[in-house]
């Protein structure tokens, strides 16, 4: 199966950064994407889609440092279903995107010390404790991508609304 999402849009709110008990950073952002289309009567239609996105590790910290409400970004990631029980005991769920890479697209950043078009992939999303960087290591080597630990969703087919 293939699960890949690519979104270009603007942040709907400032980055919400917190740290997990493991020490890894988690940033929650919201993105608004627009789709323009031609209606049957010939006029232009505009459809806005709001998407919640989770960023992990160094990517989350970079997003918190450089992004703010209104920033234009490109996200590559995967679609996930989050499930929880609310305060009244109701089972709730929603779709969100777990980002695997982030590109900042604002052109104004280029003139202010710049981050335009930089790609911050979260291949290092799991923290490395006690690791030291060596000047003798081979250039352009990257650590392999490690999937963040996401708990398995326990849901019956009868609970799915469609």
Swiss-Prot record:
Which SUPFAM superfamilies would you find in this protein's record? Nucleic acid-binding proteins
Sequence motif Important for interaction with partner proteins, location on chain: 157-162
Q: Name one GO molecular function term.
A: single-stranded DNA binding
Keywords, ordered alphabetically: DNA damage, DNA recombination, DNA repair, DNA replication, DNA-binding
A cellular component term (GO) from this record? Answer: nucleoid
Q: Which PROSITE patterns does this one have?
A: SSB
Classification via InterPro entries: NA-bd_OB-fold (IPR012340), Primosome_PriB/ssb (IPR000424), ssDNA-bd (IPR011344)
Task: Give all residue intervals belonging to the SSB domain.
Answer: 1-106
The record's function comment reads: Plays an important role in DNA replication, recombination and repair. Binds to ssDNA and to an array of partner proteins to recruit them to their sites of action during DNA metabolism.
- Which PANTHER family has this protein been placed in? SINGLE-STRANDED DNA-BINDING PROTEIN (PTHR10302:SF27)
The protein's matches in HAMAP family, at most eight in alphabetical order, are given as: SSB (MF_00984)
* Name of the protein: Single-stranded DNA-binding protein
Q: From which source organism is this entry? A: Wolinella succinogenes (strain ATCC 29543 / DSM 1740 / CCUG 13145 / JCM 31913 / LMG 7466 / NCTC 11488 / FDC 602W) (Vibrio succinogenes)
Q: Which gene encodes it?
A: ssb
